[in-house]
Structures are given as C-alpha cells and as structure tokens.
C-alpha cells in the first residue's frame, strides 16, 4: 500500500488500551482502534485521553488506524 492510498482524518482519543493501542473517535462520529506510529514512539511523545490526533486509515479496513500526529 502506497502512502497516497491512506485516508487522513482528525479525531479525539477516548481511552488508552493495552499494547499501545487507543480508542479514537473521529470527527465524523465513528470510533476506530488506532496504534502509535513509529516516529511518535521513537520521540517518546505521550498520548493521553482527550488529545486531538491525526489518524491514517487504510481503505481496506476503516475500523483500524495509525496515529501519526498529536496536536499541541
């Protein structure tokens, strides 16, 4: 899957789950399961409930995503 195929949406972190997973509510009301991208993990960026984040979704599975940015 190339980088052009992903869908980027904004959302809000609802709750942290085990294994660095998060339940994220998207701006359109859908809830997705998202994990943290490698760059966020390498830079030790903390993600807490209530944070606004950008999530990349695959067009093949819209119920799972990757958190790629946390807004300040």
UniProtKB/Swiss-Prot annotation:
Task performed by this protein: One of the essential components for the initiation of protein synthesis. Stabilizes the binding of IF-2 and IF-3 on the 30S subunit to which N-formylmethionyl-tRNA(fMet) subsequently binds. Helps modulate mRNA selection, yielding the 30S pre-initiation complex (PIC). Upon addition of the 50S ribosomal subunit IF-1, IF-2 and IF-3 are released leaving the mature 70S translation initiation complex.
Keywords of the record: Cytoplasm, Initiation factor, Protein biosynthesis, RNA-binding, rRNA-binding
Gene: infA
NCBIfam families given in the database record: infA
InterPro entries to which the protein is assigned, alphabetical: NA-bd_OB-fold, RNA-binding_domain_S1_IF1, S1_domain, TIF_IF1
Name this polypeptide is given: Translation initiation factor IF-1
Membrane-traversing stretches: none
Compartmental location: Cytoplasm
Assigned protein family: Belongs to the IF-1 family.
């Amino acid at each position: 899957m190339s980088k052009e195929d992903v869908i980027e949406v904004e959302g809000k972190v609802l709750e942290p789950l085990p294994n660095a997973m998060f339940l994220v509510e998207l701006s359109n009301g859908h809830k997705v399961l998202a994990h943290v991208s490698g760059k966020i993990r390498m830079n030790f960026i903390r993600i807490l409930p209530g944070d606004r984040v950008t999530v990349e979704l695959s067009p093949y599975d819209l119920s799972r995503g990757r958190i790629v940015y946390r807004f300040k």
